[in-house]
């Protein structure tokens, strides 16, 4: 499931790769440049942190946020194993980010925002932490007309689906938060007829 990374994960710690549960590569289309500050929401074991660290170089900075102490520890261990000095992992929730306002160039997230029941708060937080002209690039799951019985199914919720909203709702939420130039860059069909869409969603502030 690292097909979207095209060599970008070569040489990275196996623990980061084996515990990557994303649904895409949020950096695949990103114009991340050396010196940029990148924030990864729900960094997990850290695979996207490490890919981002390579892109921003020594002059840049990468911040990962995850809500579980276990994943924060694992991500820190993988960062240390990979030898990056420009990556910091913080424990926190995406609805209330432990990140200064106007401090990051890029917000990335891989299959996480769909799990939040308070997406408007997440989108508002993204808008808050981005610098003027900063950008967001997300791989996430969107659905069309998810039946209530499925939405209530906690097993599906845990596997990234029942918390998802429609593409239109997702994009509207980003716009309400004050983000502009909101667009879907690529769509991948996924699962059955009731679970049709993963979109890489890109926009900038």
Tell where the protein language model's regions lie, with residue ranges.
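Conserved alpha-helix/loop element of class I SAM-dependent methyltransferases that forms part
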Residues: 2-37, 51, 55
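A short SAM/SAH-binding and catalytic strip from SAM-dependent methyltransferases
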Residues: 105-118
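Short conserved loop adjoining the S-adenosyl-L-methionine
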Residues: 96-101, 117
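A short glycine-rich, Lys/Arg-flanked "PGG" loop and its adjoining helix->strand segment in the class I
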Residues: 120-135
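Short, glycine-/aromatic-enriched active-site segment of Class I SAM-dependent methyltransferases
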Residues: 142-161
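Conserved S-adenosyl-L-methionine
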Residues: 171, 179-191
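Class I SAM-dependent methyltransferase SAM/SAH-binding core
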Residues: 33-96, 121
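Short alpha-helix
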Residues: 162-178
């Amino acid at each position: 499931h690292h097909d979207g990374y095209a060599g970008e994960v070569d040489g990275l710690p196996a623990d980061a790769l084996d515990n990557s549960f994303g649904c895409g590569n949020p950096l695949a289309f990103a114009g991340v440049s050396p010196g940029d500050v990148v924030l990864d929401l729900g960094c997990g074991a850290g695979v996207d942190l490490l890919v981002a660290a390579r892109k921003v170089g020594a002059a840049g900075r990468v911040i990962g946020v995850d809500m579980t102490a276990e994943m924060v520890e694992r991500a820190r261990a993988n960062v240390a194993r990979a030898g990056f000095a420009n990556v910091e992992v913080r424990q926190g929730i995406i609805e209330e980010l432990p990140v200064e306002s106007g401090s990051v160039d890029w917000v990335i997230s891989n299959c996480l925002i769909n799990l939040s029941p308070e997406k408007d708060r997440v989108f508002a937080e993204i808008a808050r932490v981005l610098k003027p002209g900063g950008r967001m690039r997300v791989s996430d799951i969107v659905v069309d007309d998810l039946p209530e019985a499925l939405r209530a199914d906690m097993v599906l919720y845990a596997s990234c689906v029942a918390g998802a909203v429609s593409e239109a709702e997702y994009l509207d939420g980003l716009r309400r938060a004050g983000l502009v130039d909101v667009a879907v860059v690529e769509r991948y069909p996924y699962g059955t007829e009731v679970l049709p869409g993963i979109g890489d969603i890109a926009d900038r502030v």
